[in-house]
Amino acid sequence: MMAKSIQYDTAARHALEQGIDLLTEAVAVTLGPRGRNVVLEQKFGPPQIVNDGITIAKEIELDNPLANTGVALLRQVAAKTNDAAGDGTTTAVVLSHAMVKEGLRNIAAGANPMAIRRGIDQATQFLLDQIAEHALPVKDSNAISQVGTIAAGNDETVGQMIAAAMAKVGQQGVISLEEGQSMQTEVEVTEGMRFDKGYISPYFVTDAERMVTTLDDAYLLLTDKKITLVNALLPILENVTQTGKPLVIIAEDIEKEALATLVLNQLRGTVRVAGVKAPGFGDRRKDLLADIAVLTGGQVISEDTGLTLENATLEMMGRARQVVITKDHTTLISESNEAAVKARCEQIHRLIDETDSSFEKEKLHERLAQLSGGVAVIKVGAATETEMKDRKLKLEDAINATQAAVEEGIVPGGGTTLVHLAPQLEDWSAEHLVGDELIGAMILVRSLSAPLRQIVENAGLNGGVVVEQVKTLPFNTGYDALNNQYVDMFTAGIVDPAKVTSAGLRNAASIAGMVLTTECIIAEQSQATTKDLANAG
C-alpha cells in the first residue's frame, strides 16, 4: 500500500483550489459564442478539437494527487449537469469555481464554513424557484431551433436540423445520431422506439468515453424469462456467432453464470453482445415485449407461446438496423415493418376505445406513441474524422438542450438570467438570513455574474463593465457577445433551457459547499505532491 499524504484546514482547501483553478481555466475558454477550442491529444488517432466542457473535464488528470482531488470534484459538477440536462457543463464549472474562490476568501477571514454552506443551500433553493417562475414554454419549432443553435455553439444549421427532426417525430419523439457516409448531414425518419431500460452490465459498452453501446445490424432475442444458466443460451449464441452479427438480449433479467458468459464473450470479441432488462412489469412487460417483436419482426420466447430458449432459432429473432444502449435508455432503429406496426397500432387503438380505466388508457396511449412515433436519425456528415467527432458532440448537446427546453421551458441565455436574479437574491437574503448564513448567500450573489463575465472576456471585452450594464436593464434584456450589443434575448434567440440553468446551479452549489466544508484530504503521496507543497509554503 502506498504512503498517504494528509493535509488539514487551509492547506487542504488550498490543494483542492489548485485543481479547481486548473480545470476551470481549461474549460472556461470555450464558453459563449466567441469561445475558443481546446485540442485534446489522443493516444491513438488524430488529435480531437473540442468546444465541449464535459469532454475537456474528462481528459484532465494531474500529477499531484491532492490537486487532482479538486479536479475530480469539479469534474463531478460537469458530469452531474450533463447527466441531468445534457448541456450547460461549462457554465456549471465556471459558477462552482466562482463560489469556491469567493467562499475561501470569507473562510480565511474567519467565517464559519458550515453556516456558509447552509446559506448557499437556502439561496440556491430560492434561485431554483425563481428560474422556474421566469421560464417560458417552448411553443414552436422556431424556439426549438434557437435553443439548438445556442447549444451547438451558434451553429444555425444544427438548430434548424433539430427543429426539423422534432417536427417529424414530435416534441416527445426520439432523435438518434449516426455517422453518415457523405459530407452532408441529413435527417431521416425510420421505424423505431426507445424505452427506459439500459444495459445490465457496463462491460457491454462499445464506447467507453461516452459509456454507450452501439450495435449495427443486430439480432434481437426477446424473452419474458429470467436467464441464469448459460446452457439455455448456447444454441442461439452459436447460431448468431456464425452470422458475424451482434446480438441484443432483452429479458426479464440476466444473472449469474449467463451474465458472466455473455460479458466474457463480449470482452474476448467472440460475439458482440449486450443484455438489456425488458421494460415494464407483469402483463405490461409482456405487451411491451410483443410491441418490440412486431417492430423488429421477431417473436417473444415465452412459455405462454410454448417457446423455450433452448429451441429458439434465428428465424425467431428480431432484427434492428441499429441499437443504441445507455445506462438508462435503449433505442431501437428497425428495418421497415410498416404493415405489421400499423396493424399493431390499430389493435392498440381498439383497446383504448374498449377500456374504461383512465390508467389503462394512459398506458395504452404511451405504447401507441412509442410504437407509432418512429425515430428521427440524424446522419452526421463531415470532411474529416476530427470534424465528425466535433459535429457529433455539438449535435448531442443540441438534442439534449432542446429536449430539456421542451420539458421545463426557456429563460434568457448567455448568463443573463443569473445576473438579473442576483439583486432579487440579495434582497431576499437580507430579509431571511443573518450572520454567516447571510455571508453564504452573498457568496452566491457575487458568483452569479461569473458566466456572463467569462462570455464577455472570451469575446475580448471587459466583463465587469458589461455585467454592471446588464443589471440596469429589463429581465429579458442581455448582452449579445456575437454582435457586441444589448438585445431582448428572446427576440434575438439567445435562450437557455430552464432545466440546464437549474441543473448547473444546483450542482455547482452542491460541490462548492462540499469544498468549503472540507477540513482534511487524504491522498496517495507522490514526488509532485512534495514539490508542490514545498512551493506553496
UniProtKB/Swiss-Prot annotation:
The keyword Transcription regulation does not apply. InterPro entries: Chaperonin_Cpn60_CS, Cpn60/GroEL, Cpn60/GroEL/TCP-1, GroEL-like_apical_dom_sf, GROEL-like_equatorial_sf, TCP-1-like_intermed_sf. SUPFAM superfamilies: GroEL apical domain-like, GroEL equatorial domain-like. One of its GO terms (biological process) is protein refolding. GO terms for cellular component: cytoplasm. Keywords: ATP-binding, Chaperone, Cytoplasm, Isomerase, Nucleotide-binding, Plasmid. GO terms for molecular function: ATP binding; ATP-dependent protein folding chaperone; isomerase activity; unfolded protein binding. It comes from the Bacteria. It is found in: Cytoplasm. It catalyses: ATP + H2O + a folded polypeptide = ADP + phosphate + an unfolded polypeptide. Gene3D superfamilies: GroEL, GroEL-like equatorial domain, TCP-1-like chaperonin intermediate domain. Its main location: cytoplasm. Signal peptide: none annotated. ATP binds at T30, L31, G32, P33, D87, G88, T89, T90, T91, G414, D480, A481, L482, D496. Its EC number is 5.6.1.7. Together with its co-chaperonin GroES, plays an essential role in assisting protein folding. The GroEL-GroES system forms a nano-cage that allows encapsulation of the non-native substrate proteins and provides a physical environment optimized to promote and accelerate protein folding. Forms a cylinder of 14 subunits composed of two heptameric rings stacked back-to-back. Interacts with the co-chaperonin GroES. Belongs to the chaperonin (HSP60) family. This is Chaperonin GroEL 3. It comes from Acaryochloris marina (strain MBIC 11017). The gene is groEL3.
